[in-house]
Swiss-Prot record:
Highest taxon listed in the record's lineage: Eukaryota
Functional note: In neurons, plays a role in the regulation of intracellular Ca(2+), possibly by acting as an activator of ATP2A2/SERCA2, thus increasing the efficiency with which Ca(2+) is removed from the cytoplasm. Inhibits differentiation of embryonic stem cells into neurons and inhibits neurite outgrowth, likely as a result of its role in intracellular Ca(2+) regulation. In pancreatic beta cells, lowers Ca(2+) levels in the endoplasmic reticulum and enhances glucose-stimulated insulin secretion.
Topology with respect to the bilayer: Single-pass membrane protein
InterPro entries reported in the protein's UniProt record: TUNAR
Record-annotated membrane-spanning stretches: 24-44
The encoding gene: TUNAR
MF GO annotations: ATPase binding
Cellular component GO terms, alphabetical: endoplasmic reticulum; endoplasmic reticulum membrane
Region (Disordered): 1-20
Name of the protein: Protein TUNAR
Length: 48
């Protein structure tokens, strides 16, 4: 009985970890896209 309750807690922790990882991955992707946009604008601005 104790083992199943520990597994339930572990499962909840893993779901939370998975959600945190997906949020961090999305933030990383958004940050990368914003960096590319800034680089493009700076390149265009400096070549004018």
């Amino acid at each position: 009985m104790v083992i199943t309750s520990e597994n339930d807690e572990d499962r909840g922790g893993q779901e939370k970890e998975s959600k945190e990882e997906s949020v961090l991955a999305m933030l990383g992707i958004i940050g990368t896209i914003l960096n590319l946009i800034v680089i493009i604008f700076v390149y265009i601005y400096t070549t004018l």
